Design a protein with these regions (language model features):
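Flexible, substrate/cofactor-facing loop regions flanked by secondary structure
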Residues: 264
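Surface-exposed acidic/polar loop and edge beta-strand patches at domain peripheries
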Residues: 1-192, 204, 215-252, 267-387
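Histidine-centered active-site/metal-ligand motif
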Residues: 212
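Mid-to-C-terminal polyanion-binding domains and interfaces
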Residues: 258
């Protein structure tokens, strides 16, 4: 298929475009769903120098942060925002983040996006693994993209793909190259992520990745519901035990609510495809997160039902691993390896549900998958953490 391409950033050729506005007219395309891509350099506070790419197609607007590993800040569909309200209000430039701060929790100083990639040398909670001190959720999210490109199909329906390359390289440690592709098709309330991890080094390496996908109001509200086809669900730690019976229901915001995390072993179809759905109390707004269990075999549900100011949010997080520190997950078989010059693909999709019929259809698909297996609620965490 023939495509139009526009390179935005290319570190190898010292090329970078700023403050531009492209439209379908820029490519000589006439279409029923006009599109545009706008670039901004942000100013002030810790967002000084951060960059924002805003892609609009029809009634969908997606904001990307190339300075922060092409994170998706939020998505707006027909006036409904999908994302969440963090106490971190700025789009923080990684130059101002010390990931070693707060006992390895410095990553949280920039955490406010809808889609955050955690990895790739490690993901999960901070702590010592062997002789290494691992910070929260790895380093990729605080790495700017080295290459960014817009691609538009010449032929209808003129699918749009925003691609980026983010490198995770450290002498004697890793030589990872991550290609990130996000595609949208006109007329669909859906975006599709296809990422590729490549080990450019000469040695086999461990890797981990978690897609930390986060949703707040209006999709999240009291009386809302999670629908996740699962073989088993267990509490992450002792605190989460008290919420196990209601792991899939949404309570109102509550001051003093500490995060509750649940480990899920999902059910998939014969091709490995599965979906998790979150919808509001009226079941007329929601989101369906699709992924493949051959690539991302486990799911973490993160419930942070704190006050709206502090962060009223639920995470639907498919990954190669749970959120435990890497040292605990080898025994679970959840620290995969990638050989020299090998690659791994990860596919994640987001379908934005805008009415009762769309919500009901996605929930029915989940129920159909669950019908094949009896869900087990396991009382004990998979890992015994130090008190």
């Amino acid at each position: 298929m023939f495509t139009f391409e526009h390179i935005i950033t290319d570190s190898e050729n010292n090329h970078h475009e700023v403050d531009f506005h492209l439209t379908n007219d820029s490519f000589g395309i006439t279409c029923t769903a006009p599109f545009s891509l706008t670039h901004q350099v942000l100013s002030g506070g810790k967002q000084q120098g951060s960059e924002l790419l805003t892609l609009t197609q029809g009634d969908m607007t997606i904001r990307f942060v190339p300075t922060r590993a092409m994170a998706i800040l939020d998505v707006v569909v027909a006036g409904t925002r999908f994302g969440w309200d963090s106490s971190v209000k700025e789009v923080v430039n990684p130059a101002f983040i010390n990931q070693e701060a707060f006992g390895g929790l410095g990553w949280l100083e920039g955490f406010n996006e809808m889609v955050v990639r955690c990895g790739y040398q490690w993901a999960g909670h901070p702590g010592v693994d062997g002789e290494e001190m691992l910070t929260l959720h790895g380093r990729i999210q605080n790495t700017p993209a080295s290459f960014v490109k817009l691609t538009v199909d010449q032929s209808p329906p003129h699918n749009i793909t925003l691609s980026a390359r983010v490198d995770e390289k450290c002498f004697k440690r890793s030589d990872f190259e991550v290609w990130m592709h996000v595609s949208v098709a006109p007329g669909e309330n859906k975006l599709v992520i296809r990422d590729e991890l490549i080990n450019r080094g000469d040695y086999e390496r461990e890797y981990q990745v978690i897609y930390h996908n986060n949703f707040g109001t209006p999709v999240l509200d009291a009386g809302g519901q999670l629908h996740v086809p699962a073989k088993s669900v267990s509490p992450f730690n002792e605190y989460a035990k008290q919420g196990l019976a209601s792991w899939d229901s949404i309570d109102p915001p509550r001051k003093g609510f500490d995060e509750m995390v649940f480990n899920v072993f999902p059910i998939s179809d014969e091709q490995g495809n599965t979906t998790a759905v979150l919808h509001n109390a009226q079941a007329n707004k929601g989101v369906a997160v699709g992924y493949n269990t051959s690539q991302l075999p486990v799911l973490t549900i993160w419930k942070n039902l704190d006050t709206p100011k502090q962060g009223y949010v639920v995470g639907i997080e498919p990954g190669t691993s749970f959120a435990y520190n890497r040292r605990y997950q080898r025994a679970l078989g959840l620290v995969p390896t990638i050989g020299a010059n090998e690659s791994r693909e990860f596919d994640v999709s987001f379908t934005f549900l805008m009415n009762e019929q769309q919500v009901a259809s996605q929930v029915a698909d989940v129920i159909c998958l669950q019908h094949t297996t009896l869900l087990s609620l396991d009382d004990e965490p998979l890992v015994t953490l130090p008190s």
